Amino acid sequence: MGNKISPTSFRLKITDTWKSKWFSKLNFADMLQEDVRIREYLEAHLKKAGLSRIDIERLNDGTITVIIKTSKPGLIIGKGGAGIEELKKRILSKLGIKKEIKVTIEEVRDINMHAQIIANQIAEQLEKRMAFRRLMKQTLEQVMQAGAKGVKVAMGGRLNGAEIARTEHTSAGKIPLHTMRADIDFARATAFTTYGTIGVKVWIYKGDIFEDKK
C-alpha cells in the first residue's frame, strides 16, 4: 500500500502537515480553487527561484497568506522588497482574486535535501537534453552526500528521444515506504522536451522522526 499512494499524504500529521491551512463550511470549493490557481501561477512564474514548497493560510477576515519556501529568496524579494509587491499585484490582477494577500518568503538552505527542488532541477536539465542516466547518477551522489539515508529517482516518457516511452528508476540507500514514522520527502515535476513530456519523481528519506528519542 505504501508504494501506491503519495508518501506525503500517507504520513500527514506524522512527518508532515497540510499545505493549505484554513477551514470553511460554505465556500470550501471556491477557496480550494483559489489555492490551486495561486500555486499553479507561482510554480509557472518562479521556476528559476528554487521553489521547495508553497503553503497557504487564511484568516477569518479573508486575508490570504502565501508562504513561499525557496533556495533563492533574492530573486523573489527583489530590491527593497519590490519583487514581493509586484508579485502580489500580479496574483490579484491575473487570477482575479479580490482579497488581501500577504506574501512571506522563507529561505531553504540545504537544497539537496528537498525533493521538490531536486525534481525541478532534473526537469530543467532534461529540457536541456542532458542524458537521463547521467542525471540520475549525479542526483543520487548529491543527495546522499548531503546526509540523506536514501534516495530514489524515477523518470517516465520518451527518454533520450526513444520511440517507445518507458519508465526508468534508480535508488541509493533505503526508502521504507511502509514505515509511517519514516520522514520521506516526495515530489513530482514535468520536463517539456521536443519529444514530449517526461515525468520526474523523487523520494528522499531523511530518517525516522523518533530517532532522536532512541
Where would I find each of the regions flagged by the language model?
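RNA-contacting regions in translation and RNA-metabolism proteins
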Residues: 1-214
